From Swiss-Prot:
InterPro entries: DUF1444 (IPR010838)
Organism: Staphylococcus aureus (strain MW2)
Family statement: Belongs to the UPF0354 family.
One Pfam family named in its UniProt record: DUF1444
Protein name: UPF0354 protein MW1686
HAMAP family: UPF0354
Length: 285
């Protein structure tokens, strides 16, 4: 399977939609947009092809479902009936777009040197990121959106599964409600887990649909955490960061874990980017 074959497969699977397609050969992306208002999404074909080797048709089904829901929610409609309980925070990488395709700034806040908090209107099976043009229709200020979203994310259930590896405990929050990574904003929940930890607490949001918390008690734990975050990061539909965060008393600090077999392979580009982001974040605070 190559990008051209994947392009054709997706176009065939999405032929029931009233959309147009625009293929960018150089960037290996496919933009899918509505014919009535030109709103749409852009997907990276090379990333899907890479996942296809492992997940086969399942990844295609996931993309088709995602596009179906996104295109449906991009229809022009009123936002006046939206309730406060539908305002939610979503976590994105700091490299995520700051504006819509039409050039309208999104409502977002810095979170860490690696992550940013965007805000969204929950629409059931999908959500729509809030931009400045929507504030008037929502009849909300940016501050009200922040407060509502944090209140709502704290109301989400925080069920998790655990796994123990060589004395280290790993917690996985994976409810697939679109806000698993957003639970990193629930300080009360993180503090609850921190109280149970016997070693160093690490937190990771490799992609939108998972939050990993680890109680690291030995060197093996760090290696496992590094492997987990990279594994989830490469397989997520909305990847965020492959780095973990140290957590202590409400404070998150991005860290770069060196695997035991890679001590001489410390990527200077990764370190340089992390340090640059960290300096910029601290300067702007």
């Amino acid at each position: 399977m190559n990008t051209f074959q994947m392009r054709d497969k997706l176009k065939e699977r999405l032929s029931h939609l009233d959309v147009d397609f625009k293929f960018n050969r150089e960037e290996e992306t496919l933009r899918i947009y509505r014919t009535d208002n030109n709103k749409g999404i852009t997907i990276k074909l090379n990333a899907i092809v890479a996942k296809y080797e492992d997940k086969k048709e399942k990844i295609v089904d996931e993309i088709v479902y995602y596009v179906d829901e996104a295109i449906a929610q991009m229809a022009d409609k009123t936002l006046e009936s939206i309730s406060s309980s539908q305002i939610m925070p979503v976590i994105r990488a700091t490299s995520f777009d700051k504006k819509t395709k039409q050039g309208v700034p999104f409502i977002y806040d810095e979170h860490t040197a690696e992550t940013a908090v965007y805000y969204a209107v929950d629409l059931g099976k999908s959500y729509r990121l809030i931009d400045e043009s929507m504030l008037e229709d929502l009849k909300l200020t940016e501050q009200q959106i922040r407060e509502m979203s944090l209140f709502n994310v704290r109301k989400l259930s925080n069920s998790y599964t655990t796994d123990e590896v060589k004395g280290n405990t790993f917690y996985f929050i994976n409810s697939n409600d679109g806000y698993d990574a957003s639970r990193i904003l629930n300080t009360a929940f993180l503090n609850e887990i921190e109280a149970q930890c016997q070693g160093e607490m690490l937190v990771a949001v490799p992609h939108q649909d998972v939050l990993i918390i680890a109680d690291i008690r030995n060197k093996t734990g760090y290696d496992v955490m590094a492997h987990l975050t990279m594994e989830f990061f490469t397989k997520g539909l909305v990847p965020i960061t492959s780095l973990s965060f140290g957590y202590k008393q409400g404070h998150l600090e991005p860290i770069f874990i060196l695997g035991k077999n890679n001590k001489q392979k410390r990527d200077p580009n990764v370190i340089q980017r992390l340090e640059a982001n960290r300096r910029k974040f601290n300067k702007d605070k």
